Amino acid sequence: MKERDLLIFLNAINFSSENSLKVLDYLIDKNLPLEDFYKLDFLEEKILTERSANRLDERAGDFDLIIEKISEKINSIGVHIVTILDEDYPDELRYIEDPPSVLYVRGNLKIYNPIAFVGARSHSSYGNMAVNKIIDDLRFYDFTIVSGMAYGIDTLSHRRALLNNLNTIAVLGTGIDVIYPKSNKALYEEISEKGAVISEFPPGTQANKFTFPMRNRIISGLSKTVVVVEAKDKSGSLITARLAAEQGREVFAVPGNITSIYSVGTNKLIRDGAIPLVEIKDILDFYPGILSKKDNEEKIDLDLEEMAVYNLIEKGINNTNDICINLNNEVFYINKILTKLELKGIIEKISMNEFQILK
């Protein structure tokens, strides 16, 4: 038996990460064979509560079957598992107070300059504009936008990141195979293709009042900074802000109109010590060296649509049809943008439908 298989099994029977790691650490500390986990009285040893110990006793005999079913399930949906024991487990998460023992991953879990965006599920037009403005300004740098793919600010943040060809990671409050809300199915697929969707919950887990607060610690834990865009007085995003502060992350809040219910939470965060996010420099100051990564001055004159096309060509997606597919737009519209970029001397045509960057 492998240590990671034990963690996957415990996760599958709904053990918390804390209890899963307690069980594994006890076996390792006592130099006991992993295969004997079911023979131990974890209740007597005060490792587990009676409820958890009973669940372990009841399900221990299903170990092989559960591991087999999990393996079949994730293979069928293009998901892989990363445990806290693995080298490719995110370092950002490894050292938080309650790290997830298991992560189900759909996509490529690459993380650089991670920044979380959280906020109200119902939001104002100001919140929409704030997300667009901030993420548009981040497009000149290699940021990873982390959020929760819920209604509202989460969805806006992921979509704007994708539009700007920024890496994005969605942390679910459900199992990796449960899309919530269902209306975000297309977004789920696009994030999986161009970034990553992750969950600590076993496949099939439905949304409930406990899963979303639990996933908030992962959103903040993955990130170096957290931006709260809009929040009512009792908003769940304030939980993420609190967790971020406890994890030593910097918390930004977008200042809002004092008469708006959607800005009560963010304004109070600022009053209590969060950094008011007024301009993009406020964020960049917390990512030393990012300005030296690449000189993007020549891109500044491009509008958002031109930038989206430019970024694709720069990545090697230089065929007109492929650009249309990636940006989900019609050929005639993309051709107009390509022509504008040609006239600006930024790209050139190298074949009937292919282009390359000139500068």
Spans of features found by a protein language model:
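Glycine-biased, small-residue-rich flexible motifs in mid-sequence functional cores and linkers
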Residues: 1-2, 81-359
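Short, positively charged patches
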Residues: 1-129, 133-140
